[in-house]
UniProtKB/Swiss-Prot annotation:
It comes from the Bacteria. The gene is rsmG. The lineage of its organism: Bacteria, Pseudomonadati, Pseudomonadota, Betaproteobacteria, Burkholderiales. Pfam families: GidB. It comes from Cupriavidus metallidurans (strain ATCC 43123 / DSM 2839 / NBRC 102507 / CH34). This is Ribosomal RNA small subunit methyltransferase G. Belongs to the methyltransferase superfamily. RNA methyltransferase RsmG family. Its main location: cytoplasm. Keywords: Cytoplasm, Methyltransferase, rRNA processing, S-adenosyl-L-methionine, Transferase.
Amino acid sequence: MGGSRHFAVDDAAQRRRLEAGLDAIGLALTPAQVDTLFAYLTLLRKWNGVYNLTAIRHPDEMLTHHLLDSLTAVPALAEAARSANVAQGARGRVLDVGSGGGMPGMPLAISCPDVSVLMVDIVQKKTAFLTQCRAQLHLTNAAAHWGPVEKIDDEQGYAVITSRAFAELTDFVTLSGHLLAPGGKLIAMKGVYPQAEIDRMEAAGLMADWQVEAVPKLVVPELDVERHLVVLSRR
């Protein structure tokens, strides 16, 4: 396995960078929540050394490219989950499709205890990791599901369905759209402005039923990269 390489970790420095990143994003978390975020990052590092959960192995890059990158989307995801005009049973429910090691679902669940997050992945070792995190971090508002999202049947539906590295917009909408509650939002995390993906949605005929509401730009602390959210809703 590729986990044999060892990296020295300065936990105190990483925690300071995490706290600075949270300040830059505008996420006001309690010290206990910051502790839990850092504990999650530590678990990700440890499990990744054995189970290859992510190709990113350096602790500094795990902090920036995974945790801070995901945390930038948390305010928008939480606001959409709380304010979506959905039925009572779907309110505050978020589905994270292709969650992998838990991004962005785990940071969202830690940051927003009033939001219920289900993280889905087809790789069993990844959902096993997420289930372990839920237990060790005492996250009663988080859960993991192993299997393809298109096979899930949930009558309540979700206020928000999100993905970070799951698929093209066309596949994201096609495979997971049936789980979105009426009035809910699909929110995909993307890099550069995904005009080509939006065009392919149009070419596939999906714009007859779906619309792009907004494509806000995100700024990730410590990363000089382009990041956007694509917010979709049913017409």
